[in-house]
């Protein structure tokens, strides 16, 4: 599979640094008193683990909203797993929602409607989804495809000189 013209491949090291940077930003929010993390699966699982460790949060819940069905474009949104009712009390006040990325904002909108008082944080944000997120680390253009490390494998890369031989 070739990368699109605007590709943003993220290594494990880079993602870990970015998730820790998000943790640092979140450490000052809500006076550091989070009741729980609700991570949006599957993309929110990895950053949620890092953030939970960094902020000392023990309660981690998931909500599953499927949108990328073929890894190339967003399909119809479907909630596959709901949030535990106890965390929905008080509209999610004191709860931290974590995802890897907000793209169009459709997934974020569904989860935000479930927990309007929760604090929504993503590692990466695109312009259409950015208004739904309270905290993020890096903004990328809407037409950039982010390749996360858990979606990639190691493959041989031709030397640049091979394409520029005179």
UniProtKB/Swiss-Prot annotation:
Chief localization: membrane
Subcellular localization is given as: Cell inner membrane
> Keyword annotations for this protein?
Cell inner membrane, Cell membrane, Glycosyltransferase, Magnesium, Membrane, Metal-binding, Purine salvage, Transferase
Q: How does it sit in the membrane?
A: Peripheral membrane protein
UniProt cofactor(s): Mg(2+)
Q: Which InterPro entries match?
A: PRibTrfase_dom, PRTase-like, Xanthine_Guanine_PRibTrfase
* Biological process according to GO: GMP salvage; purine ribonucleoside salvage; XMP salvage
Instruction: Please list the residues that bind xanthine.
Output: 103, 146
Q: Which residues bind guanine?
A: 103, 146
- The name of this protein is Xanthine-guanine phosphoribosyltransferase
Q: What's the source species for this entry?
A: Mesorhizobium japonicum (strain LMG 29417 / CECT 9101 / MAFF 303099)
């Amino acid at each position: 599979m070739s990368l699109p013209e605007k590709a943003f491949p993220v290594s494990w090291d880079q993602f870990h640094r970015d998730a820790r940077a998000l943790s640092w930003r979140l450490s000052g929010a809500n006076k550091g008193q989070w009741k729980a993390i609700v991570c949006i699966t599957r993309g929110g699982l990895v950053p949620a683990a890092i953030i939970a460790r960094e902020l000392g949060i023990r309660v981690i819940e998931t909500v599953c909203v499927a949108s990328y069905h073929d890894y190339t474009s967003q399909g119809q949104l479907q909630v596959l797993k709901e949030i535990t009712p106890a965390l929905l009390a008080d509209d999610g006040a004191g709860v931290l929602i974590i995802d890897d990325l907000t793209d169009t904002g459709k997934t974020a909108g569904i989860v935000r409607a479930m927990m309007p008082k929760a604090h929504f944080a993503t590692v990466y944000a695109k312009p259409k989804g950015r208004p739904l997120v309270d905290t993020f680390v890096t903004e990328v253009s809407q037409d950039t495809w982010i390749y996360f490390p858990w979606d990639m494998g190691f493959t041989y890369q031709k030397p640049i000189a091979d394409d520029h031989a005179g």
